């Protein structure tokens, strides 16, 4: 069976056909390539004395690469990885002439170490797409291994506690079971962890553990947390956002 995050290839194919250049344009933040909250947090992180000021950066789940291109304006050379071959092709097309590279790769696989060592690793909303505990453990362990000693890991992810009343109002048709969101999909049975609810099939879409549980996952992989920001749910967004910077 397929991993739920492998469905991103179909989404990027649809984006390409519609002329949509980045995930934010397609999803939550209309018309913005890198949203203001992300820029604010990354700007604060990059200003810290414990943050590398130059070197090699890798973005995990880079999509079409807007965040990586933004970071690489700050004296970094970059590599973006993603499981979607269409996303990687789009990223390469949008990054011609810049000091960034892209390749198809899966951060949850053991062979990810072949991509090299880095001073900075950034997860721009990839983690919450990884559902199974086994894959999340691999995500954190592999991220640690990709960094040089003293390298910095930045995670930005959705988390709980969620406002379930707002979820019902805002996320029409979706389900929230425990710490996993599910979306209706006719081919859900092709994917790990699908659910059948009232005669309809749903596939896992997002894993949103309690923010304290995510901090525990980060520490268990060997990271030292240096900075974190946590936003509350709102009437427009039932899930919370966690941003963390941690040293390897």
Residue spans for each PLM region:
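A short acidic, Gly/Pro-enriched loop at the edge of an enzyme's catalytic core
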Residues: 112-121
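A short glycine-rich, Lys/Arg-flanked "PGG" loop and its adjoining helix->strand segment in the class I
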Residues: 137-149
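Class I (Rossmann-like) S-adenosyl-L-methionine-dependent methyltransferase catalytic domain
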Residues: 1-112, 154-248
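A short SAM/SAH-binding and catalytic strip from SAM-dependent methyltransferases
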Residues: 120-134
């Amino acid at each position: 069976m397929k991993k739920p995050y492998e469905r991103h290839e179909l989404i990027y194919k649809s984006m390409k056909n519609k002329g949509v250049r980045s995930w934010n344009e397609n999803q939550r933040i209309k018309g913005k390539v890198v949203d203001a909250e992300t820029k604010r947090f990354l700007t604060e992180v990059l200003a810290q004395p414990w943050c590398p000021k130059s070197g090699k950066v890798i973005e995990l789940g880079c999509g079409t690469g807007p965040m990586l291109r933004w970071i690489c304006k700050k004296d970094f050379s970059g590599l973006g990885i993603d499981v979607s071959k269409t996303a990687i092709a789009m990223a390469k097309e949008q990054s011609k002439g810049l000091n960034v590279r892209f390749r198809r790769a899966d951060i949850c696989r053991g062979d990810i170490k072949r991509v090299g060592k880095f001073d900075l690793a950034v997860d721009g909303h990839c983690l919450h797409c990884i559902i199974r505990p086994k894959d999340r453990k691999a995500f954190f362990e592999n991220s640690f291994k990709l960094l040089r000693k003293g390298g910095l890991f930045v995670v930005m992810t959705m988390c709980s506690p969620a406002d379930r009343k707002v979820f019902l109002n805002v996320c029409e048709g979706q389900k929230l079971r425990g710490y996993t969101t599910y979306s209706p999909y006719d081919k859900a049975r092709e994917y790990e962890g699908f659910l059948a609810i009232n005669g309809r099939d749903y596939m896992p879409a997002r894993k949103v553990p309690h923010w304290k549980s995510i901090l525990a996952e980060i520490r268990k992989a060997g990271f030292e947390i240096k900075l974190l920001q946590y936003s509350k749910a709102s009437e427009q967004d039932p899930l919370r956002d966690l941003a963390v910077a941690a040293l390897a």
